[in-house]
Amino acid sequence: MTLTVSPQESAHQQDESVTPRTYEVRTYGCQMNVHDSERMAGLLERSGLVKAEGKVADVVVFNTCAVRENADNKLYGNLGMLAPAKEANPGMQIAVGGCLAQKDRDTILKRAPWVDVVFGTHNVGALPTLLERARHNEEAQLEILESLDVFPSTLPTKRDAVYSGWVSISVGCNNTCTFCIVPSLRGKEKDRRPGDILAEIQALVEDGAIEVTLLGQNVNSYGVEFGDRQAFSKLLRACGEIEGLERVRFTSPHPAAFTEDVIEAMAETHNVMPQLHMPLQSGSDKVLKDMRRSYRSSKFLGILDKVRTQIPDAAISTDIIVGFPGETEEDFQATLDVVAKSRFATAFTFQYSKRPGTPAADLPDQLPKAVVQERFERLTALQDQISAEENARQIGREVELMVTAGSGKKAAETQRLSGRAKDSRLVHFAVPEGEETPRPGDLVTVTITEAASFHLVADPLPGSVYRLRRSRAGDAWDLAQAEFCGVPNGAQGTSDGGKSSVSLGMPTIPVLPAR
């Protein structure tokens, strides 16, 4: 499409070269959305926009989730809050993308007519063009594709953490879980070629990253498109050959396709972390059948046994849905039993949310809210107890942490920084008097001194250790700080030197006094 630019518009663009337009990307949902949001930010920056600092941006992009009903409410609530700002500033633009946009393509502009652009999961790369077209034509642009336009990982990226990165190995899903709307929104599975994935990882490492997380709706089915059933385990082993890559994680696998070659690759590849997220969803075989999950509780528990045999210190997390249609008290008790046997480090528990367009939405015996709530509270109480007990076992252990730019809510009060252990447990730690303060991306070895359900603490006590290993990732963080404000800024802000361009609601690392 060719646009004719008037002299007035040309002058307007020249003004913008002096004062660039600002943007913000607000992200809801899963890690795949975080990955896509980083691409949206990269596209906007390549188009000349800069991230907003402290006030409403000229361009606000919502990258949405459609898994839960409250995602709809959150989006429309936030759009409503922006309406006065849009009315006061006609040049402001609002874009809505992601899974909810793919699903509600015909609804968003009706419910929020002040939105300028609606785009889907398959055409992230079109965002700058759609924004410019909406501005030029002075009318909203709706563009939803039914198949992938460009693989998102090939798009420009503005990463929020120079020390780690998300790497998508596939998009879409071939499973047909009755509660899930994602396959209808992201399509059938499409796999990237191994060489492209490894090249992206190598580029991340060369930019300073020491950790990557491999992403897919079902990572262990990777290779189905090119007929290699062991492609994922081979990919993990290939990651082990990349010099400078210290930590490899992945999410999420599916129990039905989780094979022993993957467990062996995890155990035998030095930089694959002792962490596994394995979605259970329900401990009831009847409910699993109704969910169309294609495994049963005995297979699930068998996977955990095999993982713990080969990786004894593995921390295993899960997803669980409470209140699926037709779930009886007996079914729910089966879930509690599997949770008790599994000893998850943590669990992401959800109350079943009826999603129009999914087979489960039409099932009989939808449960009353009060029943679901009561079961949910029993499940979370059990898992919180297990998490606290499993974390208590870490007290006295020496663990290596990668320092993160996010910190705990009480960081300013406690003077603690935060990091992730190899098994992904969150640890808040204090720097001993006289020791050097680490940067995000540096690695510290500490002794765990306290434990709670959701985090660990490492404070300087007699007999405890504190060892700092400065890393390339920390150097990259310093460089990003210098590029943003002229000089490195100690341990403050996000990886790119200021407010995150991709908003996740994460706290920033505190400023510690000189030691």
Curated annotation (Swiss-Prot):
Positions that bind [4Fe-4S] cluster 2: C173, C177, C180
Record-annotated MTTase N-terminal domain positions: 21-136
Domain of life: Bacteria
CDD domains xref list: Radical_SAM (cd01335)
GO MF terms, alphabetically ordered: 4 iron, 4 sulfur cluster binding; metal ion binding; N6-isopentenyladenosine methylthiotransferase activity
Binding residue positions for [4Fe-4S] cluster 1: C30, C65, C99
EC number: 2.8.4.3
Principal location class: cytoplasm
Residue ranges occupied by any TRAM domain in the UniProt entry: 392-462
Keyword Iron-sulfur set for record: yes
Polar residues: bias regions: 1-20, 491-503
Domain Radical SAM core: 159-389
SMART domains, per database record: Elp3 (SM00729)
Cofactor: binding details: Binds 2 [4Fe-4S] clusters. One cluster is coordinated with 3 cysteines and an exchangeable S-adenosyl-L-methionine.
Cofactor list: [4Fe-4S] cluster
One Pfam family cited in the UniProt record for this chain: Radical_SAM
Catalytic EC class: transferase
Catalytic activity: N(6)-dimethylallyladenosine(37) in tRNA + (sulfur carrier)-SH + AH2 + 2 S-adenosyl-L-methionine = 2-methylsulfanyl-N(6)-dimethylallyladenosine(37) in tRNA + (sulfur carrier)-H + 5'-deoxyadenosine + L-methionine + A + S-adenosyl-L-homocysteine + 2 H(+)
Keyword flag Transferase: yes
One Gene Ontology term, aspect cellular component: cytosol
Residue ranges, annotated region (Disordered): 1-22, 490-515
Function of the molecule: Catalyzes the methylthiolation of N6-(dimethylallyl)adenosine (i(6)A), leading to the formation of 2-methylthio-N6-(dimethylallyl)adenosine (ms(2)i(6)A) at position 37 in tRNAs that read codons beginning with uridine.
Family membership noted in the UniProt record: Belongs to the methylthiotransferase family. MiaB subfamily.
Subunit structure: Monomer.
Name by which UniProt lists this protein: tRNA-2-methylthio-N(6)-dimethylallyladenosine synthase
Organism for this UniProt entry: Renibacterium salmoninarum (strain ATCC 33209 / DSM 20767 / JCM 11484 / NBRC 15589 / NCIMB 2235)
